[in-house]
Amino acid sequence: MRALITTANLIVGKSGATTVAGSSIGLSNDEDRKRFKQLREESDLIIIGGNTARREPYKRTPIPLYILTHTKVRLQPKNQLAKQFLLPPAQLFKEISENFPPIESSSAVKVLVEAGPMLLQSLIDQGLIDHLYLTTNLIKDGENRISVDHLVANFELVSQEIIEETKFEQYKKI
């Protein structure tokens, strides 16, 4: 059984919007994409939910992609590294801990959660997220607003940086 280090990444608009026209892409910019890529490079595995699988471009990922869903409908994008799981989140995390290759490794599995706000909040409420990277676009806004205060309530702020119209915050679980 391997330890998991779980990191989540989310971008929001100036008033907590999580999408523009149904996707987070409209809130992103070059600096956000650069940091997003860096998080992926430091991870072993990406977890997304079914809504994210349907709305965001996940046809290719540099590392395995696990889709956590509550439906039997096949959601996997045409991605050779994608697997779909119909499990409660805690059970999926246990499955990863016990069976993520190489099984004989003693190093922690670095999991990057790129889920939407509903699944992310559920994972946070279950205590399954260790680190949260929150990007706020200080200019743009959209729909599907969330309470950022509620999202970060179980975390402490580790660092904050503002570059042009974007605020980057890093949190760790309390």
Question: What is each of the regions a protein language model found here?
Answer:
Residues 1-174:
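Enzymes that bind and transform nitrogen-containing heteroaromatic metabolites
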